[in-house]
């Protein structure tokens, strides 16, 4: 056998061996993460080139640069401790990790500086036992990453060349700029004279019907005193987690979507609404951001926060991160408004 024939034989053997071996990461390998922070390709293999870290990458798509503590002061690890939260969610997101992910929330340039505390987050979360506590650790971390990703976009103070990048500036804002009444007179929850129901808190709760329904469920006078969402940090976080956990037909809850407990109907599938982070964007602001056929800045920002937080917490992204091809839930239904 010639040298070239031997070379061809061994090349074919190596190719078949690699193709025949088990995938290393992602959905092909039980949502496993690559060692050393390597990217997981769409096909379930670990590496650092654009083939692994580019389009379709499933996790750790910065190629190992995030979440492990860099010398630029932009990434922070956690110390593995409970940080005084009595163990609730501390195995998923201790205080040190919360502080690292929301690094600039207390910066003097942020209007919400000093408001969004870890203790307020934990106190509010305890009122919703399934929040961050459904499924295995990867799923639990994914839910926290998704919640913080969406709410960080809603409250971001970042800009493209901001210190540590745009995704270090979540939870910078507390109240919508140029607050408007946001009063729907057709709602069962009639507006109180002189009150404004503009976006407030992590999820930017908006409209009188959301304040009213949320207030009923939480047993708080939010319709009469919407300002509570911007003056009490525990209440503020409660409204955000309430919205996350609450299905409002025809929309499922964000919690059900991210934990894999939502099954799309035939109408959902026809509208392109399939399980994944993108449907959560549709739930929150689909009428403005979804169904445009291609990328938009708001979607990209939500996804950017989510990927950063998934990488830092050590979980995978899942599929269907955007809603570019999804029709909004309210499409063709008179009277149905976006909730944000």
Curated annotation (Swiss-Prot):
Gene Ontology molecular function terms on file: chitin binding; endochitinase activity
Domain of life: Eukaryota
The entry's keywords: Carbohydrate metabolism, Chitin degradation, Chitin-binding, Disulfide bond, Glycosidase, Hydrolase, Plant defense, Polysaccharide degradation, Signal
Presence of the UniProt keyword Metal-binding in the record: no
The enzyme's E.C. designation: 3.2.1.14
Annotated region described as Chitinase, given as residue ranges: 86-340
Residues at the active site: 154
Matches recorded under InterPro entries: Chitin-bd_1 (IPR001002), Chitin-binding_1_CS (IPR018371), Endochitinase-like_sf (IPR036861), Glyco_hydro_19 (IPR016283), Glyco_hydro_19_cat (IPR000726), Lysozyme-like_dom_sf (IPR023346)
Family statement: Belongs to the glycosyl hydrolase 19 family. Chitinase class I subfamily.
Function: Defense against chitin-containing fungal pathogens.
Protein name as annotated: Acidic endochitinase WIN6
Species whose genome carries this gene: Populus trichocarpa (Western balsam poplar)
Gene name tied to this protein: WIN6
């Amino acid at each position: 056998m010639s040298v070239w024939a031997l070379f061809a034989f061994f090349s074919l053997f190596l190719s078949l061996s690699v193709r025949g071996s088990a995938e290393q990461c992602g959905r092909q390998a039980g949502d496993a993460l690559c060692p050393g922070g390597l990217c997981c390709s769409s096909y379930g293999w670990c590496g650092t080139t654009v083939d692994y870290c580019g389009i379709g990458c499933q996790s750790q798509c910065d190629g190992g640069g995030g979440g492990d503590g860099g010398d630029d002061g932009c990434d922070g690890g956690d110390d593995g401790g409970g940080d005084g939260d009595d163990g609730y969610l501390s195995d998923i997101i201790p205080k040190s990790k919360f502080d690292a992910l929301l690094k600039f929330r207390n910066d003097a340039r942020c209007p919400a500086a000093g408001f969004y505390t870890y203790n307020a987050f934990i106190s509010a979360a305890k009122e919703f036992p399934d929040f961050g506590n459904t499924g295995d650790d990867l799923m639990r971390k994914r839910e926290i990453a998704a919640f913080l990703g969406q709410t960080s976009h809603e409250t971001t103070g970042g800009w493209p060349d901001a210190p540590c990048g745009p995704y270090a500036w979540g939870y910078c804002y507390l109240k919508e700029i140029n607050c408007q009444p946001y009063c729907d007179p057709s709602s069962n929850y009639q507006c109180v004279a002189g009150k404004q129901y503009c976006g407030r808190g992590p999820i930017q709760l908006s409209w009188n019907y959301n304040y009213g329904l949320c207030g009923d469920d939480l047993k708080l006078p939010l319709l009469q005193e919407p300002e509570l969402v911007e003056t009490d940090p525990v209440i503020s976080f409660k409204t955000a987690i309430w919205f996350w956990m609450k299905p409002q037909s025809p929309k499922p809850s964000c919690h059900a979507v991210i934990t894999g407990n939502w099954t799309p109907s035939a109408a959902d599938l026809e509208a392109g609404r399939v399980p994944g982070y993108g449907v959560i964007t549709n739930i929150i602001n689909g009428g403005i951001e979804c169904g445009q056929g291609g990328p938009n800045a708001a979607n990209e920002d939500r996804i950017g926060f989510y990927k950063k937080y998934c990488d830092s917490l050590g979980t995978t992204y899942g599929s269907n991160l955007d809603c570019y091809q999804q029709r909004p839930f309210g499409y063709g239904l008179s009277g149905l408004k976006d909730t944000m």
